Every structure is written in structure tokens, then in C-alpha cells.
Design a protein with these regions (language model features):
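Glycine/tyrosine- and acidic-biased, solvent-exposed loop/turn segments at the edges of beta-strands
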Residues: 1-64
Length: 64
């Protein structure tokens, strides 16, 4: 199955003084944009965020 790249920008919650962007996952934990790779949740869907791109998690796992 081909990867689906998320084209819509993710809604980041906040930035710090260094310009790092943060978001909150479904468990309420914060993740920082530079802490890659990471699993993130957007509108109830699970995404794999790596090197500045977000992929649907189910499509990412099919690559392995």
C-alpha cells in the first residue's frame, strides 16, 4: 500500500522561545516537533511523523 502524505498542516498547540512547535497526543502528552520520529494523533487518526512529514500510521506499518 502506498504511503499517504498528510498535506494539511498539523495544528500545533504552542511554540517555545526557540521556535520549537508542540502538540498534544491523545494521552495528553506533549511532543516537540524536533523530537523525531514520533507518533501523533490528528482528528482521531494516528500518524507517524518523521523528518518533517506525517504519514498515516497504518500505511507506514505496511511498508515494514
Amino acid at each position: 500500500m502506498k504511503e499517504t502524505l498528510v498535506t494539511a498542516s498539523l495544528e500545533f498547540l504552542d511554540t517555545d522561545g526557540l521556535g520549537n512547535k508542540f502538540w498534544r497526543n491523545k494521552h495528553g502528552n506533549y511532543h516537540r516537533e524536533n523530537d523525531l520520529p514520533a507518533v501523533i494523533y490528528y482528528w482521531g487518526d494516528k500518524y507517524w511523523y518523521k523528518n518533517g512529514f506525517a504519514y498515516r500510521f497504518d500505511n507506514w506499518m505496511n511498508r515494514l
